[in-house]
Every structure is written in structure tokens, then in C-alpha cells.
Amino acid sequence: NFNYGEILEKKPIGFPQDGGKLKPYSNLFYWAHAWTPGTKSTIGLHPHQGFEICSFVLKGNINHFDTKQNKWIPLKEGDVQIIRSGNGISHAEEIDDNSEIFQIWFDPDLSKSLKKEATYDDYSSKDFKLIDKGNRSFKVIVGEGSPMHMDSEDVCINEHYLSEGNHSFDIGKDLIHSYFIIDGEIILDKKKLERGTFFTVSSENEVVFKSSETTKIFEIISPLTPSYRTYSQLR
């Protein structure tokens, strides 16, 4: 936790020293699910370099400050920001009371990114197109038709909204699909997976499951083996 418990978090992928369910894989380096159970809380100015750092507002509001913008920028539920931290940037973030975010770090090939100037972009929820598939729909956050640009190789990010019933996701060849259940629950391989569950799927043609209620699932698709050596491979 941060700030004496004002910010609580679980880390599907954590830093080596603080423990995560998994070590870095693909070009995913770090993934934190963070929330404020009560009062708002601020994480003060701190530096980053090399990585692409994305924040996804799942609930409530956050405020972002960095040394490129030099001002506080508000973001609300459904909004996304990306810091391409390049050769260095410092930022601070304030998470409002009863708010919830993902912060996810991607490795864009540090041998190249560390030579670039840092850049920042934020995107409103309405910038992302919603595709209706009948008993489910999904929002394309990174991928075809999305305005959000990432340097990290072959990354797609979707948010799925599923009605009760049977569903399947296609699994791409040479890709790993990382899933986090934001709301609801599913039955997968006869096991109940509840809100807050993180899992990955690869080397399959599809994943078939049943949603026992209205469910929201966050998906990141990334290469099983990036074409470059990642930071975690070099350490």
C-alpha cells in the first residue's frame, strides 16, 4: 500500500522486491491494480525513464502532473493516459476518494526509447470505439481504429462487456492474452473466477467460458516473444 493505506493495491505483475503473481513477461513489465478505500491520496513527484507507463481509470477520478505538461490534468472513469518516459520525465498523481485504476508498464525496447524525448498523451473514454457483437461488446483501447499510439511492439488492449451466457475469445498465434476481471465472474474449466482475478492464455486457438452475470473483462494482447530483448531479460 501507499501513504499509510490511503492507496491499496494488488499487483498481477510486481517489481522483484515487492512480489507480484508473475514476473515480467512478453513486453509487460509491471501491472498494479490500485484503489482508494476512503480519502483521496497523492503520490508525489517521482522520475521515470524508458518505459511506456499507462494509467486506465476504472472508477472515479485521478489527477496527473508531469514535468512536460507542467500542470495538473484531470482524468475520469474510462479515460486513459500514456507516458512515453523516454530519456526521462517526472510525474505525480492524485487518486480521488473511492477511485480505482490500473497502472501498467510496457517495455518498448529500452535500447531505443532511452534515446527519445519523453511524451505524454491522454484520451477520453469517448475517443475509443465500442464494437457491438450481440451478447457482448468491446472497447478498442489500443488497436485498429484507436487513436492511442504505443511504441511497444504488437500490443492490443480491449475492454469486454459480457452479458450472462456462453462466450469465447480467439487467441492469436505467437501471442499471449492477459485478462483481468474488473466486474462480475466467469466459469472457466469448471472453476469460478471472480472480480479481481488475473489470468493469461497462450498456445490455444480460443478460450471458452461462461459468464454467470454481467461481466467486464480487461484484455492485453502482446507477443509471446518480442523481437527485442526486454529489460527483464537483460537484468
Q: Over which residues does each language-model region extend?
A:
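Ligand-binding loop in jelly-roll beta-barrel domains
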Residues: 85-112, 202-231
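A short glycine-rich, His/Asp/Glu-containing loop-to-beta-strand
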Residues: 2-45, 50-53, 101, 128-168
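Surface-exposed beta-loop interaction hotspot
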Residues: 82, 92-150
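Hydrophobic secondary-structure block in the mid-to-C-terminal portion of proteins
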Residues: 146-200
